Amino acid sequence: MLASCQKDKGNYFDPRKPIIRDVGLDIFVENNKGENLLSPATANYIDWKAIRLFYLMEDQKVEIYDLNMDCPRNICLLNELNSEWIRVIPYFLNDEEYPITYIEWNEFDTDTIQCHFLRENNGSIQVCDQVWLNGSQVYPGEEVYGVKRSFKVIK
């Protein structure tokens, strides 16, 4: 059996080019006193393992969990610069201009994140260049501790 195919001369995915996904968001969570709510030393801290991430996929809110990943919920705790914060991977695997991600801090408190992505090489290169939290643009903006694509959330 023989098979043959002709390469489309248009914009197609080229497997010889690298896949680049620069989409992570670094979120610092504080109370109104400026105390880090991801630190167990802070009263009423938020246990980062209890935070849930949902993607809006085809009008359905889908909870993210993949046991095979280092960060199965697409949320990782970072502990550097004498601080703790979370890195979130927002929804980026579609062609929507502003895909939606929900962060559920607890059963009563959910924030909405929308991102804009620069997409090239038929989607093999994706870079988050703008972020909105609950409708307000937070990136580009003032970076926290000089951390790229970071912002504060006050709870």
Indicate where each model-derived feature is located.
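Short amphipathic, basic-aromatic surface patches that mediate peripheral association
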Residues: 13, 29-44
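Tryptophan-paired
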Residues: 42-106
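Short, solvent-exposed loop/turn motifs
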Residues: 36, 59-63, 109, 137-138
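Charged, amphipathic alpha-helical segments
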Residues: 8-13, 34, 81-90
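Solvent-exposed, low-complexity, repeat-rich "mucin-like" stalks and linkers
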Residues: 24-35, 56-58
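Residues at beta-strand starts and edge strands
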Residues: 21-23, 97-99, 111
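Bacterial Sec-dependent N-terminal signal peptides
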Residues: 2-24
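Glycine-rich, aromatic-bearing surface loops/beta-hairpins
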Residues: 111-155
